[in-house]
């Protein structure tokens, strides 16, 4: 992150917050119609913390995740990632910060079909400017840790659904990001495989102190995280364990 910090605008930050949203608002416009998703939303995620975001379909959970990851631009308000104010950055700077400070895991793995598991996991390291030898070493280490050491030369089409998602988790973590954002990362898997992938993410969270922010409809999985936040009518509210 040192190289990034030399070129990006410095902003005040809470020392323990890896991601912070302040007065976040998002409204979609189509012609004269305005559809507000949320307004005045605040959120802070500490280093190593695990947070579940739950809510009804269409509540804006994925939109919130995209805003936190700098994949979408808020109508108003600010998002800080690793202390950097996202709105102050160019597209190139945001992309560089995302690659080094964040990891993403989706319901669909989004692995590149023409590349092997190893090559897919190497990609973020190469994009950060490291040479092939470093990228290969880091990718092999992560693939081994997720139980795919024997499948590194296989392409996504040759992997099972659970193996593809484990490969996606390895890719998300290979640059040792401060936070991983997951949008229903186990949603396409059967219960047993989903549990395995979820356990893997928690193990890597503990080992690397990587924060997790997971959008999920599975209240059982959500209860196992440090905090559960419900997005309801444009507001975030923390749920008591008994209410999850």
Swiss-Prot record:
Cellular localisation: Cell inner membrane
Record CDD domains: ABC_MJ0796_LolCDE_FtsE
One matching Pfam family: ABC_tran
Keywords from the named record: ATP-binding, Cell inner membrane, Cell membrane, Membrane, Nucleotide-binding, Translocase, Transport
EC number: 7.6.2.-
A GO cellular component annotation in the UniProt record: plasma membrane
PROSITE patterns found in the cross-reference section: ABC_TRANSPORTER_2, LOLD
GO terms for biological process, alphabetical: lipoprotein localization to outer membrane; protein localization to outer membrane
Source superkingdom: Bacteria
Membrane topology: Peripheral membrane protein
InterPro entries named among the record's database cross-references: AAA+_ATPase, ABC_transporter-like_ATP-bd, ABC_transpr_LolD-like, LolD_lipo_ATP-bd, MacB-like_ATP-bd, P-loop_NTPase
Residues of the ABC transporter domain: 19-244
Binding positions (ATP): 55-62
Entry's Gene Ontology molecular function annotations: ATP binding; ATP hydrolysis activity; transmembrane transporter activity
Function of the molecule: Part of the ABC transporter complex LolCDE involved in the translocation of mature outer membrane-directed lipoproteins, from the inner membrane to the periplasmic chaperone, LolA. Responsible for the formation of the LolA-lipoprotein complex in an ATP-dependent manner.
NCBIfam families recorded: LolD_lipo_ex
Similarity annotation: Belongs to the ABC transporter superfamily. Lipoprotein translocase (TC 3.A.1.125) family.
Subunit note: The complex is composed of two ATP-binding proteins (LolD) and two transmembrane proteins (LolC and LolE).
Protein name stated in the entry: Lipoprotein-releasing system ATP-binding protein LolD
